[in-house]
């Protein structure tokens, strides 16, 4: 999508590593999918909390993985 491509461009402009780019785009896509494909501008803290809780409780990801997902979401909203 155009949104994902603009995020990819922003990551590359800021010289993030390829591994970080791949990871951030994965988590942003997963976040959007989890929220029924709503545009991020139409989502807020409650959707982010629900997503992170889902990762911890249902998918049982590690704290580091949960933090990586959060960092990706923060990057998306700041850029």
Task: Give the location of each predicted region.
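N-terminal core-binding DNA-recognition domain of tyrosine recombinases/integrases
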Residues: 5-79
């Amino acid at each position: 999508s155009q949104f994902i491509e603009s995020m990819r461009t922003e990551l590359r402009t800021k010289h993030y590593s390829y591994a970080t780019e791949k990871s951030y785009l994965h988590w942003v896509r997963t976040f959007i999918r989890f929220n029924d494909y709503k545009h991020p501008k139409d989502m807020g803290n409650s959707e982010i909390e629900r997503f992170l809780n889902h990762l911890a409780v249902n998918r049982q990801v590690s704290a580091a993985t949960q933090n990586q997902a959060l960092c990706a979401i923060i990057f998306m909203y700041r850029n």
